[in-house]
Amino acid sequence: MMKKPIQVFLAGDSTVSDCPPHEAPMAGWGQVFGQLFSEGVLVRNHAKGGASTNSFVEEGRLQAIAEHITQGDYLLIQFGHNDQKPRGTKPYSTFQQFLTLFADTAREKGAHPVFVTSVQRRRFDENGRIEHTLGEYPDAMKALAKELDVPVIDLLAKTKVLYEAYGPEESKRLFVWFQPNEHPNYPDGIEDNTHFSEKGAMEVAKLVAEGIEELGLPLKDHLVSREGKEHV
């Protein structure tokens, strides 16, 4: 009998989601995440552009995950960008309440919830440092993770280091930045400091994989390097 594949469900916003071909090379990190795993792992990307914790639940997206997630699967949960907006949530009340619902949904099915703090936006100060634009949401998530004993990957901190390593100019390559007529999908040009290019999406996906390893989650044994060799 074939062993059941491990499913890794992703709940999040546009920085995680699969982007349509007409937006290429825009990509969420979830779009390329499956490339980092061996064959026994299936990534199920339920992330959606514009999603906040509350809209994701209200649109039935968490319910759709609940119907398919099973014992031993994983649910990675990254929200914050849209929870900041007026139609979103408050960090230490409704945001945490909805995150708790995500964690409980996974655990009720015998699956493992993992919180992931939001990716930073590409906003540099005059000293070449990334400015924090996510308010209290990442800290609220980390506080709740401690309370619920849910592992957390601090992608906020990891992306800050990544962007600063590239610097203000080179980091544009991680995002959807084009001059007019440089790319057929963006004839008028675009300067997007939130959404990733395919290169950026893969860099960020690798940071999530790094977080899985650092936490010592059993899922780490199924990670492969980009060259296709098992991680040592």
UniProtKB/Swiss-Prot annotation:
KW Metal-binding (keyword) present: no
Induction: Up-regulated by growth on type I rhamnogalacturonan.
Organism whose genome encodes this protein: Bacillus subtilis (strain 168)
Catalytic-site annotation from UniProt: S14 (nucleophile), E191, H195
Function recorded in the entry: May play a role in the degradation of type I rhamnogalacturonan derived from plant cell walls. This enzyme has a broad substrate specificity, and shows strong preference for glucose pentaacetate, beta-naphthylacetate, and p-nitrophenyl acetate (pNPA). Also active toward acetylated xylan.
Protein name: Rhamnogalacturonan acetylesterase RhgT
Keyword Hydrolase (UniProt): yes
Control of this protein's activity: Almost completely inhibited by diethylpyrocarbonate at 5 mM and completely inhibited by phenylmethylsulfonyl fluoride (PMSF) at 50 mM. Dimethyl phosphite achieves only a 53% inhibition. Also inhibited by metal ions (magnesium, manganese and calcium) and chelating agent (EDTA) at the same level.
Keywords: Hydrolase
Subunit: Monomer.
Similarity remark: Belongs to the 'GDSL' lipolytic enzyme family.
Enzyme Commission number, as recorded: 3.1.1.-
SUPFAM superfamilies (alphabetical): SGNH hydrolase
Activity across pH: Optimum pH is 8.5. The enzyme is more active in the 7.5-9.0 range, achieving a sharp decrease in the activity below pH 7.0.
Gene Ontology MF annotations: hydrolase activity
A Pfam family hit: Lipase_GDSL_2
Temperature sensitivity of activity: Optimum temperature is 35 degrees Celsius. The enzyme is quite thermostable in the range of 35 to 40 degrees Celsius, and suffering a decrease in thermostability above 45 degrees Celsius.
Encoding gene per record: rhgT
